[in-house]
Amino acid sequence: MAVEQEHFVHLARPLAPTSMGFTGSAPLTVHIQPQAVFSVIDHAVRRDTRDTQSTRVIGALVGTRSEDGSEVEVRSTFAIPHTENEDQVEVDVEYQKNMLALTLKASPRETLLGWYTTSHELNSFSALIQNFFASPETGTFPHPAVHLTISTEPGAPIATKAYISAPVAVSPERAAESCLFIEVPHKLLFSDAERAALGTATAAAETEARSAPVISDIETLAQSLESVSDLLERVSGFVGEVLDEERDGSHALGQYLMNALSLAPKVSATQIEADFNNHVQDVLMVSYLANTIRTQIDLAQRLATAPLVGGDKEGGEKGKDGEDGGRGGRGGKRGGGGRGGHRGEPREPREPREPAE
């Protein structure tokens, strides 16, 4: 029977004995890429809302797994058709096999990690599907199958949970439809470029024109510094209120602040300013050298093409002189000597004509 608990203790996963020599028992951590979450949300939005269909959707998780099996990264997903009612659940196994084969053919380095659903409810049907994805024939065996739940209710925040299963206190008769779900840590990954793009899209959503210009790097740096300054003021205000006993403190937040302060370099403000100025000078020097090299390349290209242009002009002038000489030769043959032509023989003098009466 599936068990759901809000507060959990992360224990080493208990696995059944395997014949493949896999004995890893380290805790599991799940990393989720944003495109995988968007794919799940798109599947939930486009689901069939007829009464005969289930209120939740399911699909497969595809990604990479570390060598020791302690970390998995969910990179993509694909939907799996299924029907679910009060008595039974049916999954299109052939569709799942074909889609998995196509996905692995497009991304050979990825593998099947588990499955997802758009409901936080864990029941006997969830155990059946979990055992299907963890089986040796169609699942992730000998590695545990990851079960990811994502809430997609309109107007509500998106909440995610990750589980693995263990055959703990399960009778052999009910092993196929029973398992113990153990919640494991998970984290949503995103890069700095994705965060910057999301910030630009958010800024466009707050304007009436629904558009936002792409600012330069200097303006982006200025905005980042302003944001950091605001965050420091908020943290300072929170710490001051806790010290003045105006609000209750948080042990988790205090530990996080201590860890963040321990990472700060133990240097003076003067040294930081000097290092920053040196860095700026290095950047300016690199920019100057890049512009100089670009100018030299342009100049070398112009010098390399200059003789070709001059040779074409000289050849054109010589061609014109030859054409004039040829024309003169033809004129000399006709008449008594043209430009560049041979002299013709003198003609006999004509008799003067008598004037007409």
From Swiss-Prot:
PROSITE patterns: MPN. One of its GO terms (cellular component) is eukaryotic translation initiation factor 3 complex, eIF3e. It holds the Pfam family MitMem_reg. Its main location: cytoplasm. InterPro entries: eIF3f (IPR027531), EIF3F/CSN6-like_C (IPR024969), JAMM/MPN+_dom (IPR000555), MPN (IPR037518). Keywords: Cytoplasm, Initiation factor, Protein biosynthesis. Residues 309-357 are annotated as: Disordered. Residues 30-169 form the MPN domain. Residues 311-327, 342-357 have a biased composition (Basic and acidic residues). GO terms for molecular function: metallopeptidase activity; translation initiation factor activity; translation initiation factor binding. Signal peptide: none annotated. It comes from the Eukaryota. It is found in: Cytoplasm. One of its GO terms (biological process) is formation of cytoplasmic translation initiation complex. CDD domains: MPN_eIF3f. HAMAP family: eIF3f. Component of the eukaryotic translation initiation factor 3 (eIF-3) complex. Component of the eukaryotic translation initiation factor 3 (eIF-3) complex, which is involved in protein synthesis of a specialized repertoire of mRNAs and, together with other initiation factors, stimulates binding of mRNA and methionyl-tRNAi to the 40S ribosome. The eIF-3 complex specifically targets and initiates translation of a subset of mRNAs involved in cell proliferation. Belongs to the eIF-3 subunit F family. This is Eukaryotic translation initiation factor 3 subunit F. It comes from Chaetomium globosum (strain ATCC 6205 / CBS 148.51 / DSM 1962 / NBRC 6347 / NRRL 1970). The lineage of its organism: Eukaryota, Fungi, Dikarya, Ascomycota, Pezizomycotina.
